[in-house]
Amino acid sequence: MAEGIDRKMDDRMEFTTSADVTVAPTFQDMHLKENLLRGIYAYGYESPSAVQSRAIVQICKGRDTIAQAQSGTGKTATFSISMLQVIDTAVRETQALVLSPTRELATQIQSVVMALGDYMNVQCHACIGGTNVGEDIRKLDYGQHIVSGTPGRVADMIRRRNLRTRHIKMLVLDEADELLNRGFREQIYDVYRYLPPATQVVVVSATLPYDVLDMTTKFMTDPVRILVKRDELTLEGLKQYFIAVEKEEWKFDTLCDLYDTLTITQAVIFCNTRRKVDWLTDKMREANFTVSSMHGEMPQKERDSIMQDFRQGNSRVLISTDVWARGIDVQQVSLVINYDLPVNRENYIHRIGRSGRFGRKGVAINFVTSEDVRILRDIELYYSTQIDEMPMNVADLLT
């Protein structure tokens, strides 16, 4: 179900956009299929967000597109609506492919596509690592209009010839900065080599560093650009604070002191390593605090079950690595704690964008040791923002 997109954020966005991009003020103005419009309204959208009103028409025209907008502004629906518009459901072949950096994000995209395409009889499969290969093969052999997946498993299914590529007309790279970072770069190229030469490429992300934009020239043709200025990228409406903890060992006591505040709604605590997540989870539980945890090396079934519990509000505090930072939408999260500041400053916006989704109040708290001060200053400079020391009444900011 779509919640209201933050229109205040829309109004403050400055789009550095290709000159020929027009704005479609309503979904009707986009000339979408009738059954797709029904799905959009049933999902809870009334009018398009800033990025949707600019990007959907361009993507539906078949243009290669680079779309950048902040977390919580409807980016997933932007490309989901576009894919649903261009596929032909009478042809039971894969026609659109979305690649995401995490399994959770790939699964979430599948559920958004299925919800928006509810009246279209669309088939969409999440093709992700850590799941049964036989099930993937069965689903793909049955025929899927859209596949949302992680690069490794998708490349594997293409090589096995279970994912047939000859009808693919659109490739979407979601959270493209993370995908194109070293880890996935080769796998992306691997997938791209198997696609028809005329495949349209859509690149979507909250952050697009210059080297990523530069790299897209290798597989995009005259792309239309829909961009927010980088210095506009700090997340409006989110309050950001730091707590000076001086030494690493003092962080744990500080977190325990904050626990009552954390459980006002729901909170996510980020650590930089899997080992740290496990250590902190054990330590919190030993001190009789209720927490759940998730990282990339857990079996997929366990990750799914933890995510479901957290989405339903059964668990209120989740400790995680950056696997959770990208695009996972849980409406009730109002507080993010960076137990460790992110190693990659571009992940900062993805982490704190988990709180205050769609214009709700959100607070981000950064634990800063004396060694972290330089990293914090670097983040402030990069996002042209100011992060103040946390006030005593932080609980009041969440209610």
From Swiss-Prot:
UniProt domain Helicase C-terminal: residue ranges: 237-398
UniProtKB keywords: ATP-binding, Helicase, Hydrolase, Nucleotide-binding, Nucleus, Ribosome biogenesis, RNA-binding, rRNA processing
Catalytic activity: ATP + H2O = ADP + phosphate + H(+)
PROSITE patterns: DEAD_ATP_HELICASE, HELICASE_ATP_BIND_1, HELICASE_CTER, Q_MOTIF
Entries under InterPro entries matching the protein: DEAD/DEAH_box_helicase_dom, Helicase_ATP-bd, Helicase_C-like, P-loop_NTPase, RNA-helicase_DEAD-box_CS, RNA_helicase_DEAD_Q_motif
Pfam families attached to this UniProt entry: DEAD, Helicase_C
GO molecular function (one): ATP hydrolysis activity
Binding locations of ATP: A69, Q70, S71, G72, T73, G74, K75, T76
Domain Helicase ATP-binding, first and last residues per copy: 56-226
GO annotation (BP), single: rRNA processing
EC number(s) recorded for this UniProt protein: 3.6.4.13
UniProt motif Q motif: location: 25-53
GO CC terms, sorted: catalytic step 2 spliceosome; nucleolus
Localization: Nucleus, Nucleolus
Motif (DEAD box): 174-177
Function: ATP-dependent RNA helicase involved in 40S ribosomal subunit biogenesis. Required for the processing and cleavage of 35S pre-rRNA at sites A0, A1, and A2, leading to mature 18S rRNA.
Entry note about domains: The Q motif is unique to and characteristic of the DEAD box family of RNA helicases and controls ATP binding and hydrolysis.
Similarity-based family: Belongs to the DEAD box helicase family. DDX48/FAL1 subfamily.
Name of the protein described by the UniProt record: ATP-dependent RNA helicase fal1
Species of provenance: Sclerotinia sclerotiorum (strain ATCC 18683 / 1980 / Ss-1)
